Amino acid sequence: MTASTPVAQTHIQSLPLLHSGKVRDIYAVDDERLLIVATDRLSAFDVILPDPIPDKGAVLTRVSNFWFRKTAHLAANHLLDTPPESVVAPEEADQVRDRGVVVRRLQALPVEAIVRGYLAGSGWQSYQRDGTVSGVALPDGLRQSDRLPEPIFTPTTKAAVGDHDEPISFAQTVERIGADLAERIRTIALEVFALATEYAESRGLIIADTKLEFGVTPEGEPVIIDELLTPDSSRFWPADAWQPGATPPAFDKQYIRDHLEALGWDKRPPAPHLTDDVIRQTAEKYREAERLLTR
């Protein structure tokens, strides 16, 4: 298996498969650890697309690990130092090399922590309707891609594969996970976003918004899980191409979303196939985001 061979699905027999998500396959190592393998699957509008993107899973893993290390002083994360090759059979090592991580086994919270620094995507659509995003009132007169006065926390539900995440207010988040956890994940998410924003800007990138996911320890402590500040979970823009009122080119899934929108797809399975050129350009955008962030 080479880096250029897309990995749409893993086939690890030495560990039990617990879950196959939009991008990641999750295996049980033991009662306290999981093996998470980022495949090259790509989802858009909560639908898995039929064509994998070469090397995407490895890029996501490297970028996530970069951010997990960079933000470890702000928030606990699920990453362990165990090499993924050490928990699978020798003949399966190629499947996890560069794209697998061994992590703490935690209870996932049923919400996703979205932080927005700019008005884009579904946030812009919501603002156009009623001037709010996830119950957060914003000033009048903002334009698409405008920088917000300050970053805002706009959580969503955590949908099953094939379903859509739905925006919820902070009060609804409290109803789902309790006031203490809701406050803590909001604080952590905003602090991580602030650090990442400052760093990315020094590299010529804008992080318009991002999604964090959290688990909890048996003691009730929040821990960042899944991925962190990747091109799948974030909207990255080149700073020199940003201007309010327009959508900048993006180093993330927005290129695919725009392509699918142009096709007139109804955003329901099955998704249309991607052309070879779209696959190639998407792979290059992921690699470029990694280069700019981690060089």
Curated annotation (Swiss-Prot):
Known pathway: Purine metabolism; IMP biosynthesis via de novo pathway; 5-amino-1-(5-phospho-D-ribosyl)imidazole-4-carboxamide from 5-amino-1-(5-phospho-D-ribosyl)imidazole-4-carboxylate: step 1/2
Primary enzyme class: ligase
InterPro entries assigned to the protein according to its UniProt record, in alphabetical order: SAICAR_synt/ADE2_N (IPR028923), SAICAR_synth (IPR001636), SAICAR_synthetase_CS (IPR018236)
ATP-binding recorded as keyword: yes
The protein's name: Phosphoribosylaminoimidazole-succinocarboxamide synthase
Annotated catalysed reactions: 5-amino-1-(5-phospho-D-ribosyl)imidazole-4-carboxylate + L-aspartate + ATP = (2S)-2-[5-amino-1-(5-phospho-beta-D-ribosyl)imidazole-4-carboxamido]succinate + ADP + phosphate + 2 H(+)
Any GO molecular function: ATP binding
Organism of provenance: Halorhodospira halophila (strain DSM 244 / SL1)
Keywords assigned: ATP-binding, Ligase, Nucleotide-binding, Purine biosynthesis
Highest classification ranks of the organism: Bacteria, Pseudomonadati, Pseudomonadota, Gammaproteobacteria, Chromatiales
Keyword ATP-binding: yes
GO CC list: cytoplasm
EC number annotated for this UniProt entry: 6.3.2.6
PANTHER family reported for this sequence: PHOSPHORIBOSYLAMINOIMIDAZOLE-SUCCINOCARBOXAMIDE SYNTHASE (PTHR43700:SF1)
GO biological process assignments: 'de novo' IMP biosynthetic process
Pfam families referenced in this protein's UniProt entry, alphabetically: SAICAR_synt (PF01259)
Family classification: Belongs to the SAICAR synthetase family.
Domain of life: Bacteria
